[in-house]
Amino acid sequence: MNWKTPSKKIYDSADLKNFEKSIAFEKLQKTLQQIILSVENHKIPPGILNVDIVTRPGRIGSIPLPSLIEPTTTTTTRENKIGPSNGNVEILIELFQYLNKLIDETPPLKGPTRFGNFACRDWHDKIDIIPILKKFKFPQELSSSNNSSSKSNIDGFLLESSYYLLNSFGSKIRLDYGTGHELSFLAFIGSLIEFKILNHPTTTEEINGKEILIIFANYYDLVRRLILVYNLEPAGSHGVWGLDDHFHLIYILGASQFINDKLAPIVQRSLSSQVINSCKLTNFYINAIAFIFRLKTGPFNEHSPIIFDIHNKVFSWTKVRQGLIKMYMVEVFNKFPVLQHFWCGEVLYPWKDHQGNDLPVNEKEETELDKPPETTLNSTTTTTTTTKVSSSTSKIPFTPAPWANTTTTHAVPRNTRNTRNPRS
């Protein structure tokens, strides 16, 4: 396999047509569909999500290290949380514990920080994820009997996959976080699923919905901690006319959790304090709303009108999910400000069409400003440099919520063309 460090392929909105033709896009859609179907009618197990992250500061003293799976946790307790022991899932949990510990060791700088705290850059500089990822039990496809070939494939996999993981924590340069970073984590999980790294080692069964929820719960608690501790800006937010300042996928996962759940709350009542308090630690949709209530005050219909609109016009969680996926296809998969930061490698997310031909790259002049993080595998450190594409963007309106056309289906719908302005 010809592994390669991911590189920039999308330089302006015209490149989105080529992205739609790419194997990379097909793989991302496949991962999205696989994940949202796997979490149907599953709850996040108790003790995984951190209640303090979705609780107003007046009720707590600080933002402590999330209680995920402690090092002293017994095997029995672990199996109660994630089912039969899956060593590679536990390694991911260890990774998030390590990243949370780095936050504890990197307090925010004192003084006013309107546009993000510079200590977040120190946090990014400290990250060294490769030693933890190398603990994975790799499948036969990567760890062949040929030692040199095995090392080459494992290093190659880590080279490409770690790029997406490192890019999922927000921008070190801009000090922001948004749906593009959330997409990078989806891509990272997709790479683990594709090479069966998350399969159960003893039974070879595929990862189940509960384990997917646990992994994403660890991720969302980490990045929301980064947002809170370092005051990260929303990346490319529409303000009140966007679904959420930072997230989108989390709502799709949460809506999917409620599908086929006979005890799921009624959609129209899901903004009530009773539902939020009872479901915020077991369901991503409600958990995300609880996080909004932590960040914002005032009438909900004024600061979050799109979500408010959902709960006045939609009557089933299947239709909620359908509408959210349609919005995702347009607002994430078809927006240049988001996808310009999604880079393509050679194996995991290649910039090739379905016949294996390289797609054209309309390269533009770059300046050293905003290049996503890169990982060096021949050392135990990660190196970060920066570049940014200078391109003009047009003023194109935000996509309206598609609640009026919500035919029930499990398939990921095809998108229509639309773009939005990047954050200034």
Swiss-Prot record:
Class of this enzyme: isomerase
Cytoplasm keyword on record: yes
Stored Pfam families: PTPA (PF03095)
Disordered: annotated segments: 362-424
Compositionally biased spans, kind Low complexity: 375-394, 413-424
Catalytic function, reaction form: [protein]-peptidylproline (omega=180) = [protein]-peptidylproline (omega=0)
Molecular function GO terms recorded: peptidyl-prolyl cis-trans isomerase activity; protein tyrosine phosphatase activator activity
UniProt-annotated location(s): Cytoplasm; Nucleus
GO biological process, one term: regulation of transcription by RNA polymerase II
Taxonomy, superkingdom: Eukaryota
GO cellular component, one term: protein phosphatase type 2A complex
Coiled-coil segments on the chain, per record: none
SUPFAM superfamilies attached to this UniProt entry: PTPA-like
EC number: 5.2.1.8
Bias (Basic and acidic residues): 362-373
InterPro entries: Phstyr_phstse_ac, PTPA_C_lid, PTPA_sf
Gene3D superfamilies linked to this entry: 1.20.120.1150
Keywords: Cytoplasm, Isomerase, Nucleus, Rotamase
Family: Belongs to the PTPA-type PPIase family.
Role, per record: PPIases accelerate the folding of proteins. It catalyzes the cis-trans isomerization of proline imidic peptide bonds in oligopeptides. Acts as a regulatory subunit for PP2A-like phosphatases modulating their activity or substrate specificity, probably by inducing a conformational change in the catalytic subunit, a direct target of the PPIase. Can reactivate inactive phosphatase PP2A-phosphatase methylesterase complexes (PP2Ai) in presence of ATP and Mg(2+) by dissociating the inactive form from the complex.
Name of the protein described by the UniProt record: Serine/threonine-protein phosphatase 2A activator 1
Taxon lineage: Eukaryota, Fungi, Dikarya, Ascomycota, Saccharomycotina
